[in-house]
């Protein structure tokens, strides 16, 4: 699985056990990702921060 990084055109191959890509952004600015990474369990969104997780290559 490869997940996008914050830098455009770069991606990261996920280590074993981390089979989700996620994108984190502030609810106030949904078009501007704050973090993009590999993760094992999708974090819960809050009032300020939203997480979008997926399990296909570069879907974040």
From Swiss-Prot:
A single BP term in Gene Ontology: killing of cells of another organism
Expression by tissue: Expressed by the venom gland.
Keyword Disulfide bond annotated: yes
Pfam families: Toxin_cobra-type (PF21947)
Key words, A-Z: Cardiotoxin, Cytolysis, Disulfide bond, Membrane, Secreted, Target cell membrane, Target membrane, Toxin
Domain of life of the source: Eukaryota
UniProt GO cellular component terms: extracellular region; membrane; other organism cell membrane
SUPFAM superfamilies membership: Snake toxin-like (SSF57302)
Main location: secreted
Paired cysteines (S-S): 3-21, 14-38, 42-53, 54-59
Ribonucleoprotein recorded as keyword: no
GO molecular function: toxin activity
CDD domains associated with the record: TFP_snake_toxin (cd00206)
Subcellular location(s) per record: Secreted; Target cell membrane
Family under the similarity heading: Belongs to the three-finger toxin family. Short-chain subfamily. Type IA cytotoxin sub-subfamily.
Function: Shows cytolytic activity on many different cells by forming pore in lipid membranes. In vivo, increases heart rate or kills the animal by cardiac arrest. In addition, it binds to heparin with high affinity, interacts with Kv channel-interacting protein 1 (KCNIP1) in a calcium-independent manner, and binds to integrin alpha-V/beta-3 (ITGAV/ITGB3) with moderate affinity.
UniProt subunit comment: Monomer in solution; Homodimer and oligomer in the presence of negatively charged lipids forming a pore with a size ranging between 20 and 30 Angstroms.
Protein name: Cytotoxin SP15c
